[in-house]
Amino acid sequence: MKYKINYSPEFLNDLFQIGDYIEIQLHNPAAADRITSGIMDSTDILVEYPETGAKIFLPGGLDSGYRFVTFEDYLAIYQIRFNEVYIARAVNVRQDYMRVLFPWLQIRSDHDE
């Protein structure tokens, strides 16, 4: 069975922001194109193998329903919804992706100390 890929507006905005930062702030348009294309390409496997990505667990070990695939220092975070893979967000591995996904959760991180 092949799954349909659906990109959220937030994911597309994240991708734009990542590319914009690399191109403008880091003055590297070639890297911006390579990184944003690589993040998109990392989701291609999900059409046939949506369970490829690692699961994201909430504190206490509860499955959040999200998974992620990686490209270099970036995560493409997604959910499997019946016959669809919903690509929710793209984040740098240095970001607190739990707070990006669950801003309402009181999650204590090492940065809070």
Feature annotation, model-predicted:
Residues 21, 42-45:
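Solvent-exposed, amphipathic alpha-helical segments
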Residues 8, 12-14, 42, 53, ...:
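A broad, structure-centric signal for solvent-exposed, well-ordered loop/edge residues
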Residues 45-85:
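Basic/aromatic recognition patch in beta-strand/loop cores that engages polyanionic ligands
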Residues 19, 26, 47-54, 98:
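Short amphipathic alpha-helical interaction/hinge segments
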Residues 6, 27, 31-37, 54-63, ...:
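Solvent-exposed interaction patches of small proteins and small membrane subunits
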Residues 71-75, 79-113:
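Enriched for short, Lys/Arg-rich terminal
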Residues 1-38:
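Arg/Lys-rich, positively charged N-terminal/basic patches that mediate binding to nucleic acids
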